[in-house]
Amino acid sequence: MELGAFSISLVVKDIHASKAFYEKLGFEVFGGDIIQNWLILKNGDHVIGLFQGMFEKNILTFNPGWDSSARTLPAFTDVRELQRQLKARGVELMTEADENTTGPASFIAVDPDGNPIIVDQHV
């Protein structure tokens, strides 16, 4: 099962301090808007999101249909099919993608330790 490009979304207290710290580790701004308190940073194929005041917990994120540079892949497993496969394996979902739609959609699962996992398709 290929879930798509992986990133981690980090809850931060001070987006400016976090940006400066991760830049010291070699990350560069790839997207987002610091004025809106969110940034996407990249170091090679590694992607992290910094979010101030948006989420309660850090989130593991998978993006079906994208590579690590947010480029659309020619072929991928649709988020609704991934949802069906995970439900068939007994994974409980907090939210579900609407099975009657196509294109962008998402669902959220939570691991046994309470870590949220979002599978978020943008294409």
Predicted feature descriptions by range:
Residues 13-16, 54-55, 63-116, 123:
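Vicinal oxygen chelate
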